[in-house]
């Protein structure tokens, strides 16, 4: 089942901003049809994602302990949240350590 993901805008926020006191990257995405498919509704999604980005297994997420994000994936979490963790892990792998992320919906679907 093909899905489209569109980056609507992105910007780098230097120093304190409306999200955090640190510099941050703000990205607005249109998840399209992905918005209607939590992680637990896509067969094999969690295992394939963890095979591609194994560092996600250490993410705490809201559970507060290592593996918390994997628990959320298996229980079902939204794709915006999944992308947030993927971006955090990819930034860490690129030598730009971070642990902060927030996912918010807007008044427009997608």
What is the predicted function of each stretch?
Residues 46-110:
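M16/MPP (pitrilysin/insulinase) zinc-metallopeptidase core fold and M16-derived inactive scaffolds
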Residues 19-58:
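Active-site-proximal helix-loop elements at catalytic-domain edges
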Residues 1-29, 89-95, 99-110:
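Charge-rich, well-structured scaffold segments of protease-associated domains
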């Amino acid at each position: 089942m093909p899905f489209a993901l569109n980056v609507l805008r992105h910007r780098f926020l230097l120093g304190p901003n409306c999200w955090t006191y640190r510099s941050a990257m703000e990205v607005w995405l249109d998840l399209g049809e992905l918005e209607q498919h939590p992680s637990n509704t896509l067969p094999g999604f969690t295992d394939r994602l963890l095979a591609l980005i194994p560092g996600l297994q250490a993410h705490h997420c809201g559970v507060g302990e290592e593996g918390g994000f994997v628990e959320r994936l298996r229980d079902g979490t939204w794709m915006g949240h999944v992308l947030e963790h993927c971006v955090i892990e990819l930034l860490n792998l690129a030598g730009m350590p971070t642990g902060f992320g927030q996912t918010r919906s807007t008044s427009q679907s997608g």
